[in-house]
């Protein structure tokens, strides 16, 4: 048996591997890799559509459209072919695998920045079935998140992967020039697997006046890039002379006629004698695009038939027929479905969009080529084929995408190769959390893609060294007690107390455990006046690894005065502040502002909870990280509702920022516990019951019951590495009655000296596992090169080296932060002050330790600032509106409207208070149209023609805005239009002769009678200039 699945390799990485399809088709063939390379040019609008057929067996892999904004139509640009035209050398073929990358990296002349984004979607169907191909709407074609990707920068690019839709697909006739001996061969394309569509066509006896006509028109979608035949049967019965004209119009995706493709057929019986006559409808048969492929893909065929009465008097006719439209090759699998649409928008005109890819084929060469090309039989391997079917049927769990970003595809190639390996060590399988698919896929460990993400590096790294301790062969973390209370009890770390699990809780049953290797299970708290909620944790305790810790529930409990008195060491516990209150027994960093809490809280282990009594420990482990915050707000919501002494029948995990719930990691390990207990896990991470905001949390809690004593029901099998040493599929549900279940003697296994040395390098102490996960997660987010190296080490099976590299790097973060020079620290402080002056506040301690301000820091700070501004405005609205204060608290009002897109208007608030639907748009008011300000621009006395033209411009703006006045941009455009109108009127005015004022000649007598003072002044001026007094 093979150790790897070669066909699966070529499906996931077609550029490097090629292999036969291991199905039942046994035909001699050759395997051929055909490249696809194109440089498409964007149009003037900067918007276009690339259509790809990822499963097509022919040379046509897709085509390119450009959006014409002037006509609002898609204009066909060109086909996308493989480098070799397959039909020239091969008779038959079928697709093995393929991939296609689309990106842009070349700028046109005069452009200095690469702009634009891609939206891509894979859907099962043909192009003509989609009503809207626009960039904004293309992602709505499918709801499957694995089949679409949006807002990808054109410089980053996307990848289209050809995943098979089935097997045992027949070879397809590629189309050859036949017969080859003729000097002018006829082009025959896809002579098999045709698609026939048709129907009945009938016109009852109809009378048409002299020289009149009767018209019939219909259209049918064909989605073809090859020949189309339209065949008729039946007959037309008529009186006297008639002319029948049939127009066949191939249409493109915009619904317009394809240029130079219309065919017209005319039949006439002019000149016959009066009386009844007949026409066989097959006279209207037509064949399209047989000699040459269509100039662009044909979306539909429109047929228009005109029946004309050639006589001068009334005449009747009737038609009884049927028609068939044959799309040659239209039924071939993959030729026009599934379809991938890649829309782009915002790119500069002339930008080169590069398409590069490869399609692998099984091909049957024509006889001339067979002489020099040896062929082999197909490969049939039911074992490999079954394995691939299981892989593809679990593609959602495995994260196999049909379209993705290029970066995601490159990362996927690094770890998806594990899917192709049949022999995966059981211990390695346990570290990758493969147990959910072990039974399904031939007992072969298949990794879930989610657990291979960088944030799970410490869990992955445990494969070689740390897994021996964490998931050892002894206690292994298998729950061993049976609890009828609905909550996990004693686990392996409290085995000596497991006997009391099925009896009612009483203090006499909970004696302190004297063994120092365990936390003391010695306290029962009265929590009947507290609100509470459960959450899962992942922990490691000092130098001992507790196998059951990944399967332990904690509980967030509100602190009342009575509970404070029951916890004497409360003031000695670590705490942090959130929402105006303290959270005890927790060490969390980077805690951001959250909604206001109603009480202090404490985080405790939950061994049992029954009738307001909580079995816990006086020496609980400290909780690190922020994944418990959602449970705190769930408990706080119960406190608001007055639900005390019991917890919802659910667990919660998620960080909280403002009123939003963030994603966390470690989900697979946490789900192992909640799935085995049969309780849902709520959060905003993939695979959980979705809670995105605190508002939706409130709705979810109302639907949940509470934890109560109940009869256990069997749940899905639960598996861990240690229990696999006995039976990897045994049921370890702690609710089941299995009294004869053996109890392991060794409950905790110390870390080996070799593993200890890995963690204690540079004199470091062993942190808790959550601290390591949080530290390594943060470090990997900042060092992408480490992420790439991590996947490389996994692929080589070097788990121990991975532990060394990741853990040492993470533990030395503080050392690296000290290397920030004083000069750089000053520059960072100046940048921070500048951001604060703009109202942007970032985490200064994190920035100074990292040594730089990232774009994500500023974007997050700006989002928080905007939320705070919206919060402040809503609180002002609340304080100024007495009606709201009568019905809602300020927190409820602010929490509700923070979830909406915009601030409410007065009318919306009034409708909301009445319980009406405020979300509907308010009908526009009829506003007075302001013409005066624009007419005044024409001057003091405009003509009536100019004033009417200005009013038309203003009316056009109001009509476009549905009665609303112009926006600032529209007002600017309107002013420019009025100025152009003035300029145009000045240019077109008839030229008038300039008026020359009459020249006034002063008589000599008038000059002599000038005042004496003026004559004296002129005389003095002339003497100063040295002029003569006498003027000739």
Curated annotation (Swiss-Prot):
Biological-process GO terms, alphabetical: proteolysis
Start and end residues of each stretch annotated as Disordered: 986-1014
Residue intervals of the Peptidase S50 domain: 501-723
Keyword terms of this UniProt record: Capsid protein, Host cytoplasm, Hydrolase, Metal-binding, Protease, Serine protease, T=13 icosahedral capsid protein, Virion
PTM comment text: Specific enzymatic cleavages yield mature proteins. The capsid assembly seems to be regulated by polyprotein processing. The protease VP4 cleaves itself off the polyprotein, thus releasing pre-VP2 and VP3 within the infected cell. During capsid assembly, the C-terminus of pre-VP2 is further processed by VP4, giving rise to VP2, the external capsid protein and three small peptides that all stay closely associated with the capsid.
GO MF terms, alphabetically ordered: metal ion binding; serine-type peptidase activity; structural molecule activity
Annotated GO CC locations: host cell cytoplasm; T=13 icosahedral viral capsid
Pfam families in the record: Birna_VP2, Birna_VP3, Birna_VP4
EC number annotated for this UniProt entry: 3.4.21.-
InterPro entries named among the record's database cross-references: Birna_VP2 (IPR002662), Birna_VP3 (IPR002663), Birna_VP4_Prtase_dom (IPR025775), Viral_coat (IPR029053)
Membrane-crossing residue ranges in chain numbering: none
Positions bearing the site annotation: Cleavage: 431-432, 474-475, 483-484, 500-501, 723-724
Protein purpose: Capsid protein VP2 self assembles to form an icosahedral capsid with a T=13 symmetry, about 70 nm in diameter, and consisting of 260 VP2 trimers. The capsid encapsulates the genomic dsRNA. VP2 is also involved in attachment and entry into the host cell.
Name of the featured protein: Structural polyprotein
Organism: Drosophila x virus (isolate Chung/1996) (DXV)
Organism classification: Viruses, Riboviria, Orthornavirae, Birnaviridae, Entomobirnavirus
